[in-house]
């Protein structure tokens, strides 16, 4: 509640600075607050308030680089505070509402292909640094799993994910990645049927982008078909994309173990499918 109140207070400053009028109830996400607003010219927009951290830093830069191509359009931004003024989309109609998961995957993949066609600008966090950090943390995580009941299988799975990641880590790529593109981060829009929101900018290989869309709606199955559809739509080498996706499972698993949690059952299922188990 303290963070929420602080962000709302910041919002008052930017309502005044950018000549905005609030016209609805604030929407609160995991790390941000969004105010529906109207600009002085009558244009409807969204004021996004958040703290700057390693995931949100550079969001304005990424949106400016994409220039609204397949993604929400940036109208104003303040890099110091991470505050963004964005075009208004229909928050009540996420891509997750499309009943056919394969159709939703096709739409997401086509948007992702547009985003990852763009080279990352200078100043965006790079995948090679992320991967190096993962390998630095891996030994301690593996050691923490030693001797735990039922953890030997988890340990082997992480070792296999790490082995796959090592095969591609030498070519980390240079595309501008979203890093968190799943069906809830695509909203219906007016100028296009669907637009992407909430990037966590990263420069790297598009194969590192696929896991969120496999994990989201995991229970609806068809994971192999969804993986193939995404790799085909993006024009990715399937084996490299497989390795990067296993690397993404490794990344999320490292975080979970370090927080004292077990591996995510659904991500384990995705990894086993990609490993042919």
Each language-model region and where it sits:
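Conserved NTP-binding catalytic cores of kinases and kinase-like/nucleotidyltransferase enzymes
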Residues: 1-71, 189-193, 261, 270-277
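An alpha-helical support segment within catalytic cores of ATP-dependent transferases
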Residues: 6-11, 15, 117-178, 189, ...
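Active-site acidic catalytic loop and adjacent metal/ATP-binding pocket
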Residues: 27, 33-38, 46-47, 74, ...
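A conserved alpha-helical element in kinase catalytic cores
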Residues: 41-85, 92-115, 221
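Conserved, surface-exposed functional patches that form binding/active-site neighborhoods
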Residues: 104-119, 123, 127-129, 199, ...
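ATP/Mg2+ or Mg2+-diphosphate-binding catalytic cores
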Residues: 144-146, 225, 252-277
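Active-site Asp-x-Gly
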Residues: 188-240, 262-265, 270
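Short alpha-helical scaffolding segments that buttress acidic/His motifs in well-ordered protein cores
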Residues: 244-245, 249
């Amino acid at each position: 509640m303290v963070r929420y109140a602080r962000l709302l207070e910041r919002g008052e400053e930017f309502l005044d600075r950018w000549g905005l009028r609030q016209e609805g109830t604030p929407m609160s996400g995991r790390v941000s607050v969004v105010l529906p607003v109207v600009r002085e010219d009558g244009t409807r927009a969204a004021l996004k308030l958040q703290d700057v951290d390693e995931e949100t830093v550079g969001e304005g830069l990424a949106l400016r680089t994409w220039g609204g191509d397949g993604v929400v359009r940036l109208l104003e931004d303040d890099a110091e505070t991470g505050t963004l003024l964005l075009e208004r989309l229909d928050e009540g109609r996420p891509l997750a509402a499309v009943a056919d998961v394969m159709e939703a995957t096709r739409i997401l993949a086509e948007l992702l292909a547009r985003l990852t066609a763009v080279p990352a600008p200078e100043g965006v966090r790079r995948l090679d640094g992320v991967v190096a950090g993962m390998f630095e943390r891996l030994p301690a995580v593996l050691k923490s799993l030693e001797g735990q009941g039922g953890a030997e299988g988890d340990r082997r799975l992480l070792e296999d994910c790490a082995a796959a990641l090592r095969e591609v880590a030498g070519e980390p790529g240079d595309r501008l990645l979203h890093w968190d593109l799943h069906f809830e981060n695509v909203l219906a829009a007016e100028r296009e049927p669907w637009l992407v929101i909430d990037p966590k900018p990263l420069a790297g290989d598009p194969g590192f982008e696929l896991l969120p869309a496999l994990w989201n709606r995991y229970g609806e199955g068809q994971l192999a078909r969804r993986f193939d559809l995404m790799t085909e739509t993006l024009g990715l080498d399937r084996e490299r994309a497989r390795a990067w996706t296993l690397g993404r499972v490794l990344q999320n698993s490292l975080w979970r173990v370090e927080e004292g949690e077990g591996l995510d059952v659904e991500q384990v299922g995705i990894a086993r499918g990609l490993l042919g188990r």
